[in-house]
UniProtKB/Swiss-Prot annotation:
UniProt cross-references to Pfam families, sorted A to Z: Ribosomal_L20
Classification via PROSITE patterns: RIBOSOMAL_L20
Organism the protein comes from: Francisella tularensis subsp. novicida (strain U112)
Superkingdom field: Bacteria
Gene3D superfamilies: 6.10.160.10, Ribosomal protein L20
Keywords, in A-Z order: Ribonucleoprotein, Ribosomal protein, RNA-binding, rRNA-binding
GO cellular component, one term: ribosome
Protein family per UniProt: Belongs to the bacterial ribosomal protein bL20 family.
UniProt protein name: Large ribosomal subunit protein bL20
Molecular function as annotated in GO: rRNA binding; structural constituent of ribosome
GO biological process: ribosomal large subunit assembly; translation
Amino acid sequence: MSRVKRGVTARARHKKVLNQAKGYYGARSRVYRVAKQAVIKAGQYAYRDRKVKKRTFRSLWIVRINAAARQHDISYSQLINGLNKAGIELDRKALAELAVYNKDAFAAVVEKAKAALA
């Protein structure tokens, strides 16, 4: 049986990791052992932050809706309560888009919510 030398596969594996670490600072982009750790950690951060991104955007939408709602003399929580009572099923992303880009439509939605609360 012939002997298997692993130079080619090792080089390919190292090259793959070092390419993923391109743009990292110092040894993290040059030394395989350090680069491998950096790439693994980067993957962990990326995975975690894909989940965090959803929370962050939801809170951003709520802040925007609250700011726009208060211009119409109603708080965020009252607005959401009014929308639920009125049977209007707009999600927070859509409400935030209306609040920022289509103020007239948002005002109409707020009036419906106020009417449902009264």
